[in-house]
Amino acid sequence: SLVKKKIIIALTILFVVISGGIYMYNKLTKPNLSPKTAKLYQHGFRLLEEQLGTYIKEHYSGVEKIEFSPIYVTEEGSTFSNAYVRPTIYDKYGNKATLGTKVNNVYPSSFGIVSHIILNFDGGGNEAIDLKDSNGNNIDVSNAQHLPEEAKLTRAKGIDWNIELLVEYGQLKDVIKDEKGSPNAEIVYNVNLSKGDE
């Protein structure tokens, strides 16, 4: 019947519009990485987030929670895109501030490829992941699911400076370098891939 036909046509149009919308949304928000590369980025950045989060949790008191941004991927089209993450620190007073974002006309760096992590595939096509230790040496963490002891940071000047700035300009309160750390701080990891904002 005509009504049935009209319904089918309307549903078809709706389907096309919705899938087109989802496709466009993904194209605009999700980076275009092959599944293998996406897996490498997610594995590597999960370890980097653990490295950064553990350092903040173990070396700063006054931290309620550390929450990571998605993995922002920029400069697509090359074999390896640039990518970075930004941790947000919550203090005990309900304030939160994100590392790697502008503080009073100063631009601290984000945490990403080359500066903090090296991602690649070896000759056999296996994941090759290096993190930097406290002295800036590369530590191979390719086979690790959790941060190995030798990749733990004992000092991290970039993080320290960034947190000092955030406290100085009142974005965070009473987040202090302290070897007692914040043992009860929660760390929220995020391995979603997203298009970068730079």
Regions found by a protein language model. Give the residues of each.
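N-terminal Sec-pathway targeting helices
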Residues: 1-17, 26
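Extracytoplasmic electrostatic interaction patches
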Residues: 103-198
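Homeobox/homeodomain signature
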Residues: 13, 18, 56-58, 137
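N-terminal export/targeting and maturation segments
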Residues: 22-93, 102-103
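Short, mixed charged/polar active-site loops
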Residues: 96
